[in-house]
Amino acid sequence: MKIIFTISFTCLLYANLSFAQTQPAWQLLGQLQTRSAKEIKASTWSIGGETLDRDYTDYHAYKKYLGPLGAKRIRLQGGWAKCEKEKGKYNFAWLDSIVNDALSQSVSPWIELSYGNPIYVGGGDAKLAGGIPTSAEALQAWDNWVRATVTHFKDRVVEWEIWNEPDISKTITGDNYADFYIRTAEIVRSVYPKSRLLAFGLAGVQRLEFVEPLFKKLQQQNKLHLVDVFTYHGYSPNPDNSYPAIEKLRQLVWKYKPDVVFMQGENGAPSTPKAITIGAMRDYDWSELTQAKWDLRRMMGDHGRGIATNLFTISDIHYAEGDHMVGVNSKGLLKTNPDKTIERPKMAYAAAQHVFSLFDNTVELQSKIKPQVNSDKISAFVYHKKGKSLLTVWNHEARPAEEFTPQPVQIKVEGSFQQPVYVDLITGKVYSIPTKNYKKTGTTYQFINIPVPDYPVVIADKSILQFK
């Protein structure tokens, strides 16, 4: 039934959305077979399930789309203010139902510990860009809630992120976030010694001065073991323009602790014009096509650099009065109705399915192999699976466009392609590459006049793909 659902959805999607992109004039071999999370043993992919703590999305409206999407993890926000509406009394029932359902679909939740709780004086704000708890009473209450939350979920949740985008708050500094992080991380680790601790959820990847105080204090206190993963966001209209700043961020963190894993903790593009959407990148016009292109470039740009990705987000988000912004953030893979129920999947949902199904942990990045291309506007990364090769390639010159004519590109790469095929990651279509478009010299393959669009496509050996 899962396969029937997926195929029917794909046909419906492309019947209703025009795809303004020239497809190769090559033999069509079939369609990538997508896999549910239950059918994927392991991968680095996560999907955003944010704002359930403030009821801006409805998990139970979108949960039937979660497993078939294929992501192996989902980011949730713990919601101190939603759990503790009366001092000292916790209600985890709302979060229990979500965690249990996600696990039943083989999707592992990771929980961000946030936000503040206004029932306490100095308790911080229960919203994006708000303050952390500061009074003695509120900090003790925070400690108690963190301890209770981790105790309650420790048999089901391994990963714990501490706060979200502290650097956009007007009241949080790098120094006081550092102190807050350390006290919280120590509680998590004391309750659950095998926990995996995620730091920051940093909004601005260029904010090195905000980041360094934490690592200085951790080093001084001999507590660098309290950071396992560094999460960052950093929205850019051209996703490929982010990486120089991300590399500087990595070098800063690795100076203190070289084994910190980097994860894109939240990123995705809107799907509507600027007059409609809110949130990051709202100053540009977007469509469901350019959203799909942008999301693919972020995912494969991260993956090619060994960075895990949490794609933001599964459902459009309905921000309410009193928060950092008001309106619909259209970065969801699922288009919502005004009551937060799901109207339908967007083009980006299918694109993400194709990535999550294909790039699991059996596909190994070959970071030492550098493809040679005849243009500096092209990104390309090489992978191996079962002794065969796979190549991702796209034009990164500009922000994803509504219309873009694929450019003929020459690629030379070391690999093993017994029968090379071309895969469009938006449509999922698999094409045979004509023999005139490639040649082999030893273990070097030269691909000739390969049509490369402004979003990632794949050249792979046919044997490592599952398609119908």
Task: Give a label for each model feature.
Residues 1-21:
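Bacterial Sec-dependent N-terminal signal peptides
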Residues 21-73, 85, 100, 104-106, ...:
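N-terminal carbohydrate-binding accessory modules
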Residues 69-228, 237:
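Substrate-binding cleft and catalytic face of glycoside hydrolase catalytic domains
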Residues 174-301, 305-309:
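Noncatalytic carbohydrate-binding groove/subsite architecture in carbohydrate-active enzymes
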Residues 269-353, 366-376:
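Aromatic/acidic polysaccharide-binding cleft in carbohydrate-active enzymes
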Residues 371-416, 456-458:
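Carbohydrate-binding surface patches
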Residues 411-430:
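Solvent-exposed beta-hairpin/edge-strand motifs
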Residues 434-468:
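C-terminal beta-strand-rich structural cap/linker in extracellular carbohydrate-active enzymes
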